[in-house]
């Protein structure tokens, strides 16, 4: 990733800032998923696949930075500790560098076409998330599909395109499912951690929209808590009791059922791939071994 920045950014101060952002990354799961899909679909040039993965990781990093700036959270991140205008400019620089790197591979014009498609979808999903467009759970799931699923589809479909030269709709489909799995799992654990951005901005998360249906007294009480910030933060001091409230309101069961539904959708789609059983199992292991507590869209 640093090599790509070095090749495209001549401003030394900006380069050093971008290097520090890259160094702060703890995982490179999108690049890993790109390379995995490239290999299982028959690709053999790992050098090219690695360069594609690095370009995609740069795009994801730019997306993470812009997401944090827009949501005004993740305050421990380096880009949230400096002037916001400087961070925004750095994010746009990374975005441009990432696209330039992918375009320069010049292997298949379809790769760049689909990268732009998924980036465009993710931005529109992010817009709907910021503006609280979702009024129903189905609308929220569609926003999640666009905002999160599109980025995972970007990594996986690009890897397949590099290997085969052809777009694979099945890969796109299960990538969207994976995005939904990652986000709804993250939303649940963020609720337990007291993410101030979601609460302060009264975000129309899937859980919030579920609670608004007021299935029982417990869901009404929980919605009241979330709508009154001081009471919500105070209730989080006793995590065990708060978790009991989530169970009584049906939130825990609701999220568990949704996770299982989309997990099975993901598995079913993977089984439709024209690949050996061992390769299908490898994809399942990669996609479905997400970590509890993940709050971002991860592969």
From Swiss-Prot:
<comment type="function">
    <text>Part of a major quorum-sensing system that regulates the development of genetic competence. Involved in the maturation of the competence pheromone ComX. Acts by catalyzing the transfer of a farnesyl group on the ComX pheromone. Shows weak geranylation activity with geranyl diphosphate (GPP).</text>
</comment>
<dbReference type="GO" id="GO:0005886">
    <property type="term" value="C:plasma membrane"/>
</dbReference>
<keyword id="KW-0808">Transferase</keyword>
<keyword id="KW-0472">Membrane</keyword>
<dbReference type="InterPro" id="IPR033965">
    <property type="entry name" value="ComQ"/>
</dbReference>
<dbReference type="GO" id="GO:0004659">
    <property type="term" value="F:prenyltransferase activity"/>
</dbReference>
<keyword id="KW-1003">Cell membrane</keyword>
<feature type="binding site">
    <location>
        <position position="71"/>
    </location>
    <ligand>
        <name>Mg(2+) 2</name>
    </ligand>
</feature>
<dbReference type="GO" id="GO:0008299">
    <property type="term" value="P:isoprenoid biosynthetic process"/>
</dbReference>
<dbReference type="GO" id="GO:0046872">
    <property type="term" value="F:metal ion binding"/>
</dbReference>
<dbReference type="GO" id="GO:0030420">
    <property type="term" value="P:establishment of competence for transformation"/>
</dbReference>
<keyword id="KW-0637">Prenyltransferase</keyword>
<keyword id="KW-0460">Magnesium</keyword>
<dbReference type="Pfam" id="PF00348">
    <property type="entry name" value="polyprenyl_synt"/>
</dbReference>
<dbReference type="InterPro" id="IPR000092">
    <property type="entry name" value="Polyprenyl_synt"/>
</dbReference>
<protein>
    <recommendedName>
        <fullName>Tryptophan prenyltransferase ComQ</fullName>
        <ecNumber>2.5.1.-</ecNumber>
    </recommendedName>
</protein>
<keyword id="KW-0479">Metal-binding</keyword>
<dbReference type="InterPro" id="IPR008949">
    <property type="entry name" value="Isoprenoid_synthase_dom_sf"/>
</dbReference>
<feature type="binding site">
    <location>
        <position position="67"/>
    </location>
    <ligand>
        <name>Mg(2+) 1</name>
    </ligand>
</feature>
<comment type="similarity">
    <text>Belongs to the FPP/GGPP synthase family.</text>
</comment>
<keyword id="KW-0178">Competence</keyword>
<feature type="binding site">
    <location>
        <position position="67"/>
    </location>
    <ligand>
        <name>Mg(2+) 2</name>
    </ligand>
</feature>
<feature type="binding site">
    <location>
        <position position="71"/>
    </location>
    <ligand>
        <name>Mg(2+) 1</name>
    </ligand>
</feature>
